[in-house]
């Protein structure tokens, strides 16, 4: 007796999710992925808002300033400025009660700033998710995405959390080079930011990372190629040699002779290079969150009291406090004209009086 077995297995119809997943993760020149659904439109709108504001939109109604190429600014002085203080923390939606669907009025009120800031934040988050997604696809660990959390933390703390802790979006940085410089001066004058321990950790992390990057790049470059006999150093390294001669042992021996210590293995070396800048950025972001709550930096009150009592006693610290007072006196009246702040002539710093 012959028994026939039907081996055909009926496959389930792919769901809409499966079809979308297949299309999004298809191998193409520019990977899209699920993260691309967040990244690509947000990055497009953020960059579009930035370039539109820089090119066409004035800050006359929000800061009393010219801030566009159309008004005569250049690439360093143009900016997408924050909304006026009167707008508070409104999202300034185009269809909201402030602009009421009027695009021109929306631009005048500073709507492009909230548009750019929010789309920029979600665009950065989308880029981090993109790194997670591709790392999973090619089966590597997601340390790139974890490292990118540092820039995201700084952006969100400076552009979103800090102004949320203050009166309004007005106190956030505008999107422009000179505008960021003004914001840095504001941070110093009103928060004594350079004496904040979190700022110190941030500087140590960023500059330390630059030093580590330079040392690491030079060391690897030094050991990639075999040294030759030519008198000229650059002729001695032959980039056309058949094999690289990179050696962790050689590099370890070099730095052991230089410093007396060296990294024992590649994993610890590269984790340290990851840890230093990311921790620095996170510490800086935490410090900015503290400033949003108006937490103070270091105060050396004993020096302040002695400087007030003894005209011959002055330190760099007390001198910096005087400079901060000057920044506040000049900047508050000019930067917040709506407050109608008036300072008597005798309290304003003049020339080299500081």
Curated annotation (Swiss-Prot):
Modified residues (Phosphothreonine): 2
CC cofactor note: The D1/D2 heterodimer binds P680, chlorophylls that are the primary electron donor of PSII, and subsequent electron acceptors. It shares a non-heme iron and each subunit binds pheophytin, quinone, additional chlorophylls, carotenoids and lipids. There is also a Cl(-1) ion associated with D1 and D2, which is required for oxygen evolution. The PSII complex binds additional chlorophylls, carotenoids and specific lipids.
Membrane association type: Multi-pass membrane protein
GO biological process, one term: photosynthetic electron transport in photosystem II
Binding annotation for pheophytin a: 131, 144
Positions of modified residues (N-acetylthreonine): 2
CDD domains, alphabetized: Photosystem-II_D2
GO MF terms, alphabetically ordered: chlorophyll binding; electron transporter, transferring electrons within the cyclic electron transport pathway of photosynthesis activity; iron ion binding; oxygen evolving activity
Binding residues for a plastoquinone: 216, 263
Membrane-traversing stretches: 42-62, 126-142, 154-167, 209-229, 280-296
Entries under PROSITE patterns matching the protein: REACTION_CENTER
Keyword list, A-Z: Acetylation, Chlorophyll, Chloroplast, Chromophore, Electron transport, Iron, Magnesium, Membrane, Metal-binding, Oxidoreductase, Phosphoprotein, Photosynthesis, Photosystem II, Plastid, Thylakoid, Transmembrane, Transmembrane helix, Transport
Keyword Magnesium included in the entry's annotation: yes
Ribonucleoprotein recorded as keyword: no
One Pfam family of this chain: Photo_RC
Role according to the record: Photosystem II (PSII) is a light-driven water:plastoquinone oxidoreductase that uses light energy to abstract electrons from H(2)O, generating O(2) and a proton gradient subsequently used for ATP formation. It consists of a core antenna complex that captures photons, and an electron transfer chain that converts photonic excitation into a charge separation. The D1/D2 (PsbA/PsbD) reaction center heterodimer binds P680, the primary electron donor of PSII as well as several subsequent electron acceptors. D2 is needed for assembly of a stable PSII complex.
Similarity comment: family membership: Belongs to the reaction center PufL/M/PsbA/D family.
NCBIfam families: psbD
Name the record gives this protein: Photosystem II D2 protein
Source organism per UniProt: Mesostigma viride
Lineage of origin: Eukaryota, Viridiplantae, Streptophyta, Mesostigmatophyceae, Mesostigmatales
